Amino acid sequence: ESFEGISVSKKIDKLGYRGLETVEMSYVDHRVPHGNVLGGEEGIGHGRRYALSALELGRINVASRSVGVAQAAFEAAMRYAQQRHTFGRPIFEHQAIQFKLAEMATKLQAARLMTYDAARRADAGERVDMEAGMAKLFASEAAFEIATDALRIHGGNGYTTEYPVER
């Protein structure tokens, strides 16, 4: 549907989120009919609050996906550490690998709990801008660190398509 004063000028190609189109939009002399105002008549003047509320849920979504990525990387590292042998035993039995896996599991659990807490509070109708932002920050950084450590546990094999951690 087109509205006077709104134009779509450019589709933006992205590295991820390919299932959701992103476009560049311009608003020139655009007026929103009262029937299209978010929240109906009562929503007039509250657009900023509604937009910020959507950002909170988006941050929880990013945190949730980050926890999923971290979980997959951790599980791949755990499987590999149990299957790969050096010096006649699984690398899982080497203390350095155990320490690394324990650190990964701790970061993963902390990210999961922060994300659950933000989601639970949002579901209860609470304002969660701080909690959602903290969960997004911590979970996304944890996912990067856990994926990096999973690659290190795999060694050179982590860079081959033979193992899922390469993704």
Explain the meaning of each model-derived region.
Residues 93, 97, 132-137, 158-167:
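Charge-rich, acidic-biased intrinsically disordered regions
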Residues 62-72, 103-107, 138-141:
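Amphipathic, heptad-repeat-like alpha-helical segments
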Residues 1-75, 79, 89:
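FAD-binding core of flavoproteins
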Residues 78-92, 105-138, 151-154:
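C-terminal helix-coil-helix/basic helical segment that borders enzyme active sites and/or dimer interfaces
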Residues 52-53, 146, 154-167:
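Glycine-rich phosphate/cofactor-binding loops in nucleotide/flavin-utilizing enzymes
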Residues 142, 146-149:
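Amphipathic alpha-helical coiled-coil segments
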